[in-house]
Curated annotation (Swiss-Prot):
Gene3D superfamilies given in the database record: P-loop containing nucleotide triphosphate hydrolases
Name of the protein described by the UniProt record: Putative primase
Top-level taxon in the UniProt lineage: Viruses
Lineage: Viruses, Duplodnaviria, Heunggongvirae, Peploviricota, Herviviricetes
Record field: compositional bias (Acidic residues): 1163-1181
Keyword vocabulary terms for this entry: DNA replication, Transferase
Positions of the UniProt region annotated as Disordered: 1141-1181
Keyword Secreted found: no
Enzyme Commission identifier(s): 2.7.7.-
Family membership noted in the UniProt record: Belongs to the eukaryotic-type primase small subunit family.
Organism: Ostreid herpesvirus 1 (isolate France) (OsHV-1)
Length: 1181
């Protein structure tokens, strides 16, 4: 057995971390080991070290076996203090550390000893810096790079959070307090103001990897492994070892690094940061006495100090001068996103015993004072929280009450508290004061689940928010624009409003001179309801477009074309496009790229544009650049950009990937298919076992949604323009999008109207006053933009800084309906709704046998997979030629996003779900012969934004017919209570609140509606059919009149048509409805012959279908008179159908012309091979 095979005996490997994370969530904590599997990408696989097998892995290391292993440091488990030292020697250009590596290690240990002595004082004897285990990685290919790992086995912290606090405070002590610049160096790079310490201060986060001793990175030589070493003088000196190592210049000249052998080590497991015993709940927990002592001292001394993980360096002739990031007024460009790392707070010290573990209800702001004492906040060194707490609630509590609370813990005179309160009100006058900070502080101390906010600070939307009724577009609200005029319309509006190169802090500004324009747009008011002074009316404009209309009318294309042109002109700088699907994101990128290249090659553009900006088209979603075409777009755009010149950016992102955008600011944001984006927030709520772990599923989904919404709102508030493009707007979804545009609270209603409305409902005066005050504060803060203006004094002797306060003006959103006169007919002229799913499947099988190109849409992936396997097995057994079946699932889209459309074009039968989503355009007209759609009502229905638009993206099948079946997924649900609750939601006159609140109510009402629909099949069917019919219709002209497809409901067929033996009459009925539907009721009356024949002249397949009575003696005459018999096609295979109810019978015959004319076809039951549709539904579905 090989060495690698022996290694697997102790470690159980997994492909990714998802399964390991699941075991952690279930409470199983094991030692996780990682291993390099790819040289270039650095990819790793992860495994769990079996309990009791740590010794086996240690033996492998002791034998010198290099498996490229890392230990994963569990974030919430005890861990030994460790340092990762990584630095370079100083080169000829002055970059790097100019001290020998052995002396760097000694100086680091000395400063660490002094820092710990400062923290724990008289207990400093408990820590000895020489009790350290060191490993070194010598790189033969890069001898100037030095890497050391230091582990202190006797210092154990309870978790990584405590260790992170200690290490960052140590960095603050070195570079801020002592200015120990010898332990930092300048890095190479474009930004020469950046530097770093000799030890890494950033790896103390969740699930970090630490390379094990004796291991190297994959692809590196064996000599690059981490080997144990010792500093000779450090280990051999007994008394005052630091004094012996330091010469007159403060640097040791005698320290030597000596490599150790594994045989010289007492215990190799001591070199691990987290041995298995630290993670074993059954083992004795490690002692954290010294770690706790150090941590408590760190909290006391550095609890309110902003700590940094980076240092900034400036190079001069004397050497390297290091300063902490944040001390200078100007932050280095590459570090603007660096976050302050304030030490964690021990909230338990603020808990009052009488409220411990109890439920807390906050009905008014004064109750906050009952749970906190100012003296405790001060004594606990929480002054930061104390001052913000006062500022957050002082506007809603009488001054006398606040002073009583403040003086009750203050030894000074009351005038001191009055002065504090005055400063608190003054400092908070420029901030949105809503009482949120006080509430969050209370939740942190007593727990989120134990605190209920009953103040109702802002009216909440309680309307009937089912989001299932489509918007009726009228000319009064929506402006009709022909598709070819959309681009020119957007360009005209932008040319009128935007001023090129007129950016102020990222905002394009404009001035208003006429009072009438303010009246139309709406001017912000102050707390007393007075309008803002004219001097402050230099406002940045903000605009929103809602673009709806026909499917296929080029709404998105027209918008993207205008956006590219505006960016090239410099009228837009940074643009963000958000889509719900990967396929749509790729098509958007390719469309942008095509338009960009066309404009660059247009001589008219070069003549009309004074200056054209280069555009960087980027993709920001998971595995984006694994796609070859997207990667080519990126390389082409980056090749044109001059790094010394300013360029513009267009970023395409998925709704679930906006966290990758960090803190970027975009002046224009486009939401393509926003309804689907909103629906995706609750995509994980649908689960089979709704009674099991339902609360956990909801909590996880809401948590994920909150993070996305908060990030999304942050982008929209900083942007100047928003575009919402969708063909299926609903009134509720429009309100959701408006909340993204306006902000958390609506600006349409003035505070005085809020006041009047609440008083009419009997709300108390105090509540009305506080509520209006909160709304005013929030509205003003969202609108406000503070700009620092520098001017010279009259004598021009000094510069004067002055704050210029401006407010944004929010214009009314423009509602645009796009129509195309060339699309006169609906996408589907006829919708055939099958009551029985078996009938639909019979039609599908027959269509496949005829050789037609078919697309089948299913509402769930499971349904699509089962149908795919059933049809695949059926065609392999029954057909002489095998059609190419293509299954499009979520994994297909993720693995091969660029090949999805090509697969759709190449396949014969396409099975897919809503995973492709909206926007998946198929350019070929009539690519498919027939379309089928199978919808199963579930919690995710009846909103069919994905399914409807996906079927419509086929544009028009050749026969313009959609075969559809709607079924119910659950039966027997008692929804009487849910029905009453649903009807209890009555529309109110409240304006809609925040985007997050609207989503909550959307989900709650829709879920009730879904359950009602599940129990009442009629309601669901009517709602879904209405949605489908409206969506698949087309706008006829500028009057917005809509042409809807013809609807046919296939139910029991009149038996009088089946009683006759007139073939002509039967064929007329088949054309009116469906052939198989007629035969299903009387199987013994008919035999269906389906033949596949090859045309000798044209070399193509021709399909013929013959329907005759089974007992008709003139079968051979009908065959001779048929088109096949007259034109002399050569039969290949003949298959005879005999259909029963829920049965499809097929018999194969090899025939030639003589047999077809002389032999009478008699089918006996014992010779037939049957397929039971019900049976394969049960077994295969």
């Amino acid at each position: 057995m090989s060495n690698s095979e022996k290694q697997t005996l102790a470690i159980e490997w997994f492909k990714n971390m998802s399964e390991i994370k699941k075991s952690r969530e279930n409470g199983l904590v094991s030692k996780v080991i990682a291993k390099d599997v790819h040289v270039l990408s650095g990819a790793k696989k992860y495994g769990i070290l079996w309990k009791g097998k740590e010794g086996e892995m240690i033996d492998h290391i002791a034998k010198g076996q290099n498996e490229h292993l890392y230990e994963m440091i569990d974030f919430n488990s005890p861990a030994r203090l460790f340092f990762d030292m990584d630095f370079k020697s100083k080169d000829e250009f002055g970059f790097g550390c100019d001290i020998p590596p052995n002396q760097v290690v000694v100086m680091f240990m000395e400063e660490l000893q002094l820092f710990v002595n400062k923290l724990i004082g008289h207990d400093s004897g408990k820590f000895n810096a020489k009790e350290v285990l060191i490993t070194q990685c010598k790189r033969l290919d890069r001898p100037d790079k030095h890497s050391f790992h230091l582990v202190y086995p006797k210092i154990v912290f309870r978790n990584i959070t405590q260790m992170r606090a200690f290490v960052l405070s140590f960095g603050h002590y070195l570079f801020e307090e002592k200015h120990m610049m010898s332990l930092a160096f300048q890095k190479k790079g474009k930004n020469r103001s950046l530097g770093r310490a000799v030890f890494d201060m950033s790896p103390y986060t969740r699930d970090r990897l630490f390379r094990l001793m004796g291991q190297s990175k994959m692809g590196e030589p064996y000599e690059n492994t981490l080997r144990p070493v010792k500093i000779q003088e450090v280990y051999e000196t007994s008394n005052n070892f630091f004094d012996n190592l330091i010469d007159d210049n403060g640097i040791s000249s005698h320290a030597q690094i000596i490599t150790l052998r594994y045989s010289e080590l007492e215990n190799i497991s001591d070199y691990m940061v987290q041995p298995c015993s630290f993670l074993d709940m059954d083992a004795t927990p490690p002692s954290t006495t010294l770690g706790d002592l150090i941590h408590n001292s760190v909290l006391k001394n550095y609890g309110n100090v902003p700590l940094k993980t980076y240092v900034a360096a400036k190079q001069d002739r004397r050497g390297v001068t290091i300063t902490l990031l944040g001390n200078n007024n100007k932050t280095p460009g590459n570090l603007k996103s660096a976050k302050d790392n304030i030490l964690p707070v021990d909230w338990h010290t603020l808990i009052k015993e009488e409220f411990r573990g109890k439920e807390i209800n906050i009905e008014n702001d004064e109750q906050f004072l009952e749970f906190f004492t100012a003296r405790e906040l001060k004594e606990a060194d929480y002054v930061y929280y104390y001052l913000n707490f006062i500022s957050d609630i002082c506007h809603f509590i009488p001054d006398k009450t606040m002073l009583t609370w403040m003086n009750g813990c203050d030894d000074y005179v009351s005038t001191r508290s009055e002065r504090k309160l005055f400063y608190a009100k003054e400092s908070s006058s420029k901030k949105p004061i809503t009482g949120r900070f006080a509430l969050s502080l209370l939740e942190n101390v007593y727990g989120v689940d134990n605190v209920n906010d009953l103040r109702n600070p802002v009216p909440k939307p309680i309307g009937d928010f089912k989001n299932v009724k489509r918007t009726v577009m009228t000319t009064e609200e929506w402006e009709p624009i022909e598709a070819r005029d959309l681009r020119s319309r957007i360009l005209t509006e932008q040319n009128k409003d935007l001023k090129t190169n007129n950016y102020i802090n990222g905002a394009i500004t404009m001035d208003f001179e006429k009072e009438e324009e303010y009246a139309k747009i709406g001017v912000p008011e102050d707390e007393e309801g007075n309008r803002i002074e004219m001097a402050q009316r230099f406002n940045s404009k903000k605009r929103a477009y809602f673009i709806s209309g026909q499917m296929g009318a080029s709404k998105s294309s027209g918008t993207l074309e205008s956006i590219v042109e505006l960016v090239m002109k410099g009228m837009m700088k940074n643009v963000l496009i958000i889509t719900p699907r990967i396929v749509l994101a790729k098509q958007t990128i390719l469309k942008l790229f095509t338009v960009y290249k066309e404009l660059l090659g247009d001589s008219k553009v070069k003549r009309d544009f004074k200056k054209t900006n280069d555009i960087d088209i980027t993709a920001m979603f998971h595995k984006a650049y694994q796609d070859k075409e997207i990667r080519q777009v990126k390389e082409w755009c980056r090749g044109r950009i001059n790094p010394e010149m300013e360029h513009c950016n267009i970023c395409v992102s998925l709704i679930n990937s906006i966290h990758r955008l960090n803190r970027a600011v975009y002046d224009t944001i486009i939401f393509d298919e926003p309804i689907t984006c909103i629906d995706n927030f609750y995509i994980e709520l649908h689960t089979k076992n709704s009674n099991e772990n339902a609360a956990e599923v909801v909590a996880n989904t809401i948590s994920r949604r909150n993070a996305i919404v908060n990030r999304l709102t942050g982008f929209t508030m900083l942007s100047n323009q928003l575009f919402f493009i969708d063909a299926a707007f609903t009134p509720d979804s429009i309100n959701l999008c408006k909340s993204l545009y306006y902000g958390e609270y609506s600006f349409i209603v003035s505070p005085r109207e809020w006041n009047k409305h609440m008083r009419s409902e009997g709300v108390g005066d105090t509540t009305v006053k506080n509520t209006c005050k909160r709304i005013n504060k929030e509205n003003l803060e969202i609108r406000k933009r503070i700009r620092i203006v520098k001017t010279r004094s009259e004598d021009k002797s000094q510069m004067i800084q002055k704050e210029e306060v401006t407010y944004k003006i929010f214009r009314e959103p423009q509602m645009i309906c796009v129509y195309d006169k060339s699309l006169e007919k609906p996408i589907f002229q006829k919708i055939i709704d099958y009551k029985s799913k078996n009938k639909l499947l019979n039609t599908l099988l027959e269509t496949i046998c005829e050789g037609q190109k078919v697309v089948v849409y299913c509402s769930t992936q499971k349904e699509s997979e089962r149908l795919y396997h059933a049809v695949k097995g059926w065609t392999e057994r029954k057909m002489s030629w095998i059609p190419r079946l293509i299954l499009i699932t979520g994994s297909t889209v993720k693995k091969e996003p660029g090949e999805v459309v090509n697969k759709i074009k190449d396949g014969d039968v396409i099975f897919t779900t809503s995973v492709l989503g909206v926007g998946t355009s198929i350019s070929e007209e009539g690519l498919f012969d027939c379309a089928f759609m199978i919808c199963k009502l579930s919690v995710g229905s009846p909103l069919l934004s994905d399914m409807i638009q996906l079927s419509a993206r086929v544009r028009a099948t050749k026969n313009r017919v959609l075969h559809m079946n709607i079924s119910c997924g659950q039966f027997g649900v008692d929804c009487s209570k849910l029905t009453r609750e649903l009807h209890s939601f009555q529309p109110a006159n409240y304006m809609y609140g925040g985007f997050m609140d609207c989503l909550d109510i959307t989900h709650r009402n829709r879920r009730l509606f879904h359950h009602v629909c599940i129990s009442n099949y009629t309601i669901a069917r009517e709602t879904m059919l209405s949605e489908i019919t409206d969506a698949l219709g087309h706008v006829k002209d500028a009057t917005l009149s809509r042409i809807s497809p013809e609807y046919i409901y296939v139910k029991d067929v009149d038996h009088r048509f089946l009683a006759t033996r007139d073939i002509t009459e039967q064929r007329q009925l088949a054309q009116k409805l469906d052939v198989l539907d007629c035969r299903m009721e009387h199987t013994e009356e008919f035999v269906d012959f389906v033949g596949l024949y090859k045309n000798k002249k044209e070399g193509r397949r021709v399909v013929a279908k013959i329907n005759v009575p089974k007992k008709n003696e003139l079968l051979h005459e009908f065959w001779q008179k048929s088109k096949i018999g007259r034109e002399g096609y050569t039969p290949v295979t003949h298959k005879a159908y005999s259909l029963k109810r829920s049965h499809s019978t097929m018999v194969e015959h090899d025939m030639d012309d003589d047999e077809s004319t002389n032999k009478k076809q008699e089918l006996e039951e014992e010779d037939e091979e049957c397929i039971d549709i019900d049976e394969y539904n049960n077994e295969r579905f």
